[in-house]
Amino acid sequence: MKQNKKLILSSIVAALALFLMIIAGIMPIGTYAIPVLASLLYIVLVKEIGYGWAVMAYAVTSIMSLILCADKETAINFILFFGYYPILEMQLKKIKLLVLRIIVKLTIFNAAMIVIFYIATFVLMVPASAYTVFGLYIPWIILAVGNVVFIIYDLSLIHISEPTRH
């Protein structure tokens, strides 16, 4: 594919991802669901034109999300995990030992979620009540449930990014 077509495709993906990120502010589940949807677009870039272009589109979407998204927590979720993970996941497939690959993926996810939690709490000033249910402060429970959801997300990415076998 010619360079100008690669630029056009990566620009379209970045624009679509940014559009999704911007509309996340008007959807109740947008903080988590929209970054996941936006992240799926980067699989196309990796498959069609390569990692470099996907990383460039991710960087553009990340910067523009910080500037244009009303919901900064959504932008942070995208920047610190969901935006780059599909690109990275395709590289993590190269780790042959399944147990090691799973440990690496879960470590990346948990580290990102902990950083996102602290940024949301101390920089974006998300109140502690957002992490409280029936008087219980539950960030660790949320993280545990998040690990289960992450495994489903990761398995979905694997199946989406692999060619269909007949």
Question: Where do the protein language model's features map onto the residues?
Answer:
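Alpha-helical transmembrane segments of multipass membrane proteins
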Residues: 17-21, 65, 85, 109-117, ...
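Short helix-perturbing small/polar motifs within transmembrane alpha-helices
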Residues: 79-114
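Hydrophobic alpha-helical transmembrane segments
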Residues: 7-11, 33, 55-59, 75-76, ...
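Interfacial aromatic-anchored transmembrane helix boundaries in multi-pass membrane proteins
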Residues: 22-31, 62-91
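Central hydrophobic cores of alpha-helical transmembrane segments
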Residues: 54-64, 101-110
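Hydrophobic transmembrane alpha-helices
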Residues: 1-48, 53
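Residue-level detector of conserved catalytic or cofactor/ligand-binding positions
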Residues: 156-166
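Membrane-interface helix termini and inter-helical loops of multi-pass transporters
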Residues: 123-136
